[in-house]
Amino acid sequence: MSSAYDRVSKNYRQSELDKFAAFTSGWWDPHGPQKPLHALNPVRLDYISKRVPLSGARVLDVGCGGGLLSEALARQGAHVTAIDLAPELIKVARLHGLESGIQVDYRIQAIEDLLAEQPAPFDAIACMEMLEHVPDPAAIVDACAHLLKPGGRLFVSTINRTLAAFMLAVVGAEYVVRLLPKGTHQYKDFIRPAELAAWLRHAGLHLEDVSGMRYEPWRNRARLTDRTDINYLACAISPEAPHATE
């Protein structure tokens, strides 16, 4: 891939970009290599829409991939900006947007560089299945916090660093059932909820909720659960601006 990435952001791994770029041909196939993501998408959308009125909202999708969540958010009336560092995936997302007629502002851009542009703040930011794939996830959380308007919400989904997660998300999904290619996930990069909570606090955000999310491959179905030992969703809110004093 182009060395232009070095001019954009250092907070990426080339191997991760190459890995997900290889999924382009079947990204929008609900029975293809991204089948689990298709099952998770309605759960993620419902989790967000219950906490943010999406119609007319400004929403940022960080690490948008081929645009599954981006389009779903836009269908709910949100004005969506979606960023990813993989040109191949942004191309897939744009082409599918042309086919579906759904308007999303797709960009090959790092969140640090979007922050440098000082855009209007966002009502909501989604960072789904992304933090476990970058060298410095805390920096992503911090950049997200700076891009939220007061009262705006950050939504994160990731994988807990537990034995259960290793057995199911790595051994089971990649080696036994083979839902995902081998090497998709690295156990050492999984994130415990307490670690995420610390990054959110450091960024000035208040953690509102943590909910488990479970994918059932035998049914190809996903659902929320009280158990956060494997996949989980989190919502954090930016503090309201202090009232002006006379």
UniProtKB/Swiss-Prot annotation:
SUPFAM superfamilies: S-adenosyl-L-methionine-dependent methyltransferases. CDD domains: AdoMet_MTases. GO terms for biological process: methylation. Its EC number is 2.1.1.222, 2.1.1.64. The keyword Methyltransferase applies. Pathway: Cofactor biosynthesis; ubiquinone biosynthesis. Keywords: Methyltransferase, S-adenosyl-L-methionine, Transferase, Ubiquinone biosynthesis. It catalyses: a 3-demethylubiquinol + S-adenosyl-L-methionine = a ubiquinol + S-adenosyl-L-homocysteine + H(+); a 3-(all-trans-polyprenyl)benzene-1,2-diol + S-adenosyl-L-methionine = a 2-methoxy-6-(all-trans-polyprenyl)phenol + S-adenosyl-L-homocysteine + H(+). Transmembrane segments: none annotated. InterPro entries: SAM-dependent_MTases_sf (IPR029063), UbiG_MeTrfase (IPR010233). Coiled coil: none annotated. It comes from the Bacteria. The keyword Methyltransferase applies. S-adenosyl-L-methionine binds at R44, G63, D84, M128. GO terms for molecular function: 2-polyprenyl-6-hydroxyphenol methylase activity; 3-demethylubiquinol 3-O-methyltransferase activity; polyprenyldihydroxybenzoate methyltransferase activity. NCBIfam families: UbiG (TIGR01983). O-methyltransferase that catalyzes the 2 O-methylation steps in the ubiquinone biosynthetic pathway. Belongs to the methyltransferase superfamily. UbiG/COQ3 family. This is Ubiquinone biosynthesis O-methyltransferase. It comes from Xylella fastidiosa (strain 9a5c). The gene is ubiG.
